[in-house]
């Protein structure tokens, strides 16, 4: 038995949500860098409460800054990985990106992508949503 009497499969401890998220981000980062993007920053958070967080910030070869939301799910139930990136989540990501871009004297072209991981399947959605 594991935490709160929940059965744990096998002898290894149950993975935490944070560890699973980190593993998903690692997998997404490997996929994106193999596709030619360069890592700029990871897990950027705005200061204070109510802000946003960006899982990965990468740069395309043409200079485009790419803000990436990574979502991992074991299966496609309940809308799958993509179903959890609602309008409110998109707003928080856009807010964090705007905050991040304050450090740039002349912000480069930007894009919001999503990497959806469901089991062994990885899907990269370029331009998953807009800042508008």
Swiss-Prot record:
Source organism, top-level taxon: Bacteria
MF annotations from Gene Ontology: nucleic acid binding
UniProt xrefs under InterPro entries: Restrct_endonuc-II-like (IPR011335), tRNA_endonuc-like_dom_sf (IPR011856), UPF0102_YraN-like (IPR003509)
UniProt similarity note: Belongs to the UPF0102 family.
Listed transmembrane segments: none
Pfam families, sorted: UPF0102
Protein's name in the database: UPF0102 protein Ajs_0414
Region of interest (Disordered), ranges: 1-23
């Amino acid at each position: 038995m594991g935490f709160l009497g929940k059965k744990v499969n096998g002898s290894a401890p149950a993975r935490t949500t944070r560890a699973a998220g980190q593993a998903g981000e690692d997998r997404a980062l490997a996929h994106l860098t193999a596709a030619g993007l360069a890592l700029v920053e990871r897990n950027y958070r705005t200061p204070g409460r109510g802000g946003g967080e960006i899982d990965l910030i990468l740069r395309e070869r043409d200079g485009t800054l790419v803000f990436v939301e990574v979502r991992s799910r074991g299966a496609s139930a309940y809308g799958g990985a993509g179903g959890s990136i609602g309008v409110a989540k998109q707003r928080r990501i856009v807010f964090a990106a705007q905050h991040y871009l304050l450090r740039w004297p002349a912000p480069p072209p930007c894009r919001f992508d999503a990497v959806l991981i469901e089991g062994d399947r990885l899907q990269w959605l370029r331009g998953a949503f807009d800042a508008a």
